[in-house]
Amino acid sequence: MTMRIFNFSPGPATLPEPVLRQAQDEMLEWNAVGASVMEISHRTVEFMELAKGIESDLRCLLGVPDDYAVLFLSGGATTQQALLPLNFAAPGQTADYVVTGHWSKTALKQASPYVNINVVADGERGGFQHIPSRAGWRLSKDAAYVHMTANETIHGVEFRQTPDVGDVPLFADFSSSIAADLIDVSKYDLIYAGAQKNLGPVGICVVIVRRTLLERTGQPRADIFTYASHAERDSMLNTPPTFNWYLLGLTVKWMLAEGGVQEFARRNQAKAQLVYQTIDQSGGFYRNGVAAAVRSRMNIPFFLPNVEQDARFAAEAKAAGLLSLKGHKALGGIRASLYNAMPLAGVQALVAFMHDFQQRYG
């Protein structure tokens, strides 16, 4: 019998076992159509009904208002980062970017060929261990939008409140924290999220955008790069990643059945607290320097006394059935990703291993 390990990968990430088992059961034939869902046309009545149901479920899960369009697009968050200025910034216009870690820097880089960038706040001087106070942000007078990254998977910092940016549209990358805690969607004008952390497999991205924004002219671009065109065609302007869409739908249904975002917020707080307590009570053997008020509940980086210990920890953890704990190459150390599908038992196993490792090598 195949053994399932605890997978702490930052993405592609662990998927709920019930979702995997249902997909396994339906692999050869889905919905009595005589074929797999990945084999049928996205234009069939069956798949179009599936797509509508998934959108309805996602709206229910996240509380998406009716005046927002919900798009399911091929690719991931990086693609959206390049499309934002093309769709919503006029030539020569400025966009404001809040830099809180590696991925907000990536968003800025992807947008920079198409819009003038104003960095309103930059946490790099502090080693990305805090989020600069809103009072010190240098917002532009006529910015096309303000962009933020809700959770930084590498440096482990997270916005706990939605920043007030006035009348300027607020855009947010929620790839690693969507559905992890309750948010008021109406406080954002556009949310995008690659699915491979909390929503499903890699290869599909959700975009939630205020419909009035779709009226902006933006810059010259093809239809395939135009959000309004995708909205008009119900995310079927081109052939979508149907199997990924289906798996996303199963994951959303699973989250609803488990109690919705409110329940996962409770679980995620409890899981993260276990790990942070172990770090903070280790007497410095494990270190996490992120300011307590902005510590991520999804991604927890930490360091041992030296790089040799980091490597030994990751190797022994893997042998113990705790997978993908090696930190990102940009930062090093160890990183535990605790997305919605990570069960409490996995975190308890990690914490037990941390205690054992410290006893043996501390």
UniProtKB/Swiss-Prot annotation:
What superkingdom does the record give? Bacteria
Q: Which residues carry this modification: N6-(pyridoxal phosphate)lysine?
A: 197
Q: What's the Enzyme Commission number for this chain?
A: 2.6.1.52
**One GO BP annotation here?**
L-serine biosynthetic process
GO molecular function list: O-phospho-L-serine:2-oxoglutarate aminotransferase activity; pyridoxal phosphate binding
**UniProt key word Amino-acid biosynthesis:** yes
For the ligand (L-glutamate), the binding residues are 43
Cofactor annotation comment: Binds 1 pyridoxal phosphate per subunit.
Alphabetically sorted, this entry's keywords are: Amino-acid biosynthesis, Aminotransferase, Cytoplasm, Pyridoxal phosphate, Pyridoxine biosynthesis, Serine biosynthesis, Transferase
Q: Which cofactor does it need?
A: pyridoxal 5'-phosphate
The record's section on InterPro entries has: Aminotrans_V_dom (IPR000192), Pser_aminoTfrase (IPR022278), PyrdxlP-dep_Trfase (IPR015424), PyrdxlP-dep_Trfase_major (IPR015421), PyrdxlP-dep_Trfase_small (IPR015422)
Binding residues for pyridoxal 5'-phosphate, per the UniProt record? 77-78, 103, 153, 173, 196, 238-239
- Major subcellular site: cytoplasm
Cell compartment(s), UniProt: Cytoplasm
- Enumerate the catalysed reactions: O-phospho-L-serine + 2-oxoglutarate = 3-phosphooxypyruvate + L-glutamate; 4-(phosphooxy)-L-threonine + 2-oxoglutarate = (R)-3-hydroxy-2-oxo-4-phosphooxybutanoate + L-glutamate
Q: In which pathway does it act?
A: Amino-acid biosynthesis; L-serine biosynthesis; L-serine from 3-phospho-D-glycerate: step 2/3; Cofactor biosynthesis; pyridoxine 5'-phosphate biosynthesis; pyridoxine 5'-phosphate from D-erythrose 4-phosphate: step 3/5
Q: Name one GO cellular component term.
A: cytoplasm
State the protein's purpose.
Catalyzes the reversible conversion of 3-phosphohydroxypyruvate to phosphoserine and of 3-hydroxy-2-oxo-4-phosphonooxybutanoate to phosphohydroxythreonine.
Q: How does it assemble?
A: Homodimer.
Q: Which family does it belong to?
A: Belongs to the class-V pyridoxal-phosphate-dependent aminotransferase family. SerC subfamily.
**Name assigned to this protein:** Phosphoserine aminotransferase
Native organism: Xylella fastidiosa (strain 9a5c)
Q: What's the gene?
A: serC
